[in-house]
C-alpha cells in the first residue's frame, strides 16, 4: 500500500519535468523564429535606406566632375585604422606632449580655416574657373554665329526661290492673257475696215461719175 503513492509521485514529477522541457524547447524555437524575423526586417530596412556617399569629387579643367567611390576593401582598411588609433586624453598627458598636442590641433584648425577662406575668395574672384574656359566660350560663340549665318543663308535662299516661282507664275499668266487681247483687237480692226469699205461703196453708188460722150 505504501509503494503506490510513491510511484504516483514519481510519475507526476516525470510528467511535470517533460512538460517543462517541452515548454522550454517551444519557447526557444519561438524566440529563434522571432529573432530571425526581426533580423530580416532590420536588414531589409538598412538595405532600402543605405546611400553610398562618394569618397571624393575630381574636378577637371574642362569643367566636368567625376565622383570616386570607395570600395569595400578601403572601408575595411579605414575601420581598421580607426580602431588602431588610440584615443588621447589631454588631462593625463605631461607638459611636453600636452603642449605638442594643442599646437598640432591649433595648426590643423588654422589650415582648415585658411583652406576654406581661400576657396571662397578664389570662387568670388573667378580664379577657380577652368584654365581654358575663355577658349571654350569663344569656340561656342563662333559655333553659334556660324549656325545663325547658315540659318540666314537658308532663309534667304528659300525667299529667293519663292520669289522666282511667283515671278514665273505671273509671267505665265500674262502670256496666256495677251493673245486674247490681240485677237479681239484684230476682230475690231477687221470690222472697222469692213464698215469703212461699205461706206465707200455706198457713197460711190450715190454719186455716179458722169462719163463724157
From Swiss-Prot:
The modification Phosphoserine is found at residue 70. Keywords: Acetylation, Coiled coil, Phosphoprotein. The modification N-acetylmethionine is found at residue 1. The keyword Phosphoprotein applies. Residues 147-175 are annotated as: Disordered. Residues 136-173 form a coiled coil. Belongs to the FAM177 family. PANTHER family: LP10445P, PROTEIN FAM177A1. This is Protein FAM177A1. The lineage of its organism: Eukaryota, Metazoa, Chordata, Craniata, Vertebrata.
Amino acid at each position: 500500500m505504501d509503494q503506490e503513492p510513491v510511484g504516483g509521485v514519481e510519475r507526476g514529477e516525470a510528467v511535470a519535468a517533460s512538460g517543462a522541457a517541452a515548454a522550454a524547447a517551444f519557447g526557444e524555437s519561438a524566440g529563434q523564429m522571432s529573432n530571425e524575423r526581426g533580423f530580416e526586417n532590420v536588414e531589409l530596412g538598412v538595405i532600402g535606406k543605405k546611400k553610398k556617399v562618394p569618397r571624393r569629387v575630381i574636378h577637371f579643367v574642362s569643367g566636368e566632375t567625376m565622383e570616386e567611390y570607395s570600395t569595400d576593401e578601403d572601408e575595411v582598411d579605414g575601420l581598421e585604422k580607426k580602431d588602431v588609433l588610440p584615443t588621447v586624453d589631454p588631462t593625463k598627458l605631461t607638459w611636453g606632449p600636452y603642449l605638442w598636442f594643442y599646437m598640432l590641433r591649433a595648426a590643423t584648425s588654422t589650415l582648415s580655416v585658411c583652406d576654406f577662406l581661400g576657396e571662397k575668395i578664389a570662387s568670388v574672384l573667378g580664379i577657380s574657373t577652368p584654365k581654358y574656359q575663355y577658349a571654350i566660350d569663344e569656340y561656342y560663340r563662333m559655333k553659334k554665329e556660324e549656325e545663325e549665318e547658315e540659318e540666314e543663308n537658308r532663309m534667304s535662299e528659300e525667299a529667293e526661290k519663292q520669289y522666282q516661282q511667283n515671278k514665273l507664275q505671273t509671267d505665265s499668266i500674262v502670256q496666256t492673257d495677251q493673245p486674247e487681247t490681240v485677237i479681239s483687237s484684230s476682230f475690231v480692226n477687221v470690222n472697222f475696215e469692213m464698215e469703212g469699205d461699205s461706206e465707200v461703196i455706198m457713197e460711190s453708188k450715190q454719186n455716179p461719175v458722169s462719163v463724157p460722150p
